[in-house]
Amino acid sequence: NVRAFVKDDGADEILAGYETYQAYFIHQAYRRLPSWFRHHLLQPLVDRLPASDAKVSWDFKLKRFVAAGDLSSEDAHGTWRMIFSANARARLLDPIKNSPQASADVLNLYRATFAQTNARHALNRMLYVDTRFYLPNDMLVKVDRMSMAHGLEVRVPFLDHRLVELAARVPPNLKLKHFRHKKYLLKAAMQGRLPNKILWRRKQGFNI
């Protein structure tokens, strides 16, 4: 008899819940390392790490991080959001090469979205981009299609425009505390309301 349910989409994008936000600032330091050190020592070591079948494993994260070592930090953020590399995408879409999907340059779409924001802090710039681009084109579309296929209505309270506007005014250090604690403000607000084993557990994700 259920006709509507609540989904938590949007919290990661407005309150900094992804590891890529931490990776962005690490990447800025990584790019300052000597090129020979990155290309001839670190990258070969990371490339030799054995592949793991674990969900979003450490070797996968490191390889994606290092592969973006020569990009700007904003471009790196865009590539970390992609599932397929440009070459893999071209091979997969070759049979339909004349389609808009095959010709789309996803990285340029990210750059265009970054150019739309006048936020000064890097974290707020990323949150804007992910809210405007990643959230509607990846997260929300999956939920919308699955729910509509079963005649269900999904409500997303974290995307209430008043909450989104409030989150945009919150200082970045209350979203990503000491560049370590993701969604810090939300977790602090829920302290004592949710068990710690739920509140502070590692992010599970919903990968498809």
Spans of features found by a protein language model:
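Active-site rim elements
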Residues: A122, G151-V154, N173-K177
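PAPS-dependent sulfotransferase catalytic core
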Residues: L194-I208
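Glycine-rich active-site loop/lid subdomains used to bind and stabilize high-energy intermediates
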Residues: N1-G151, K197
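Short, solvent-exposed hinge/capping segments at secondary-structure junctions
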Residues: V164-A168
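Short, conserved phosphate/pyrophosphate- and ester-handling motifs at nucleotide-, phospho-/glycolipid
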Residues: D160
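Short, charged, surface-exposed loops that flank catalytic or proteolytic processing sites
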Residues: K177-Y184
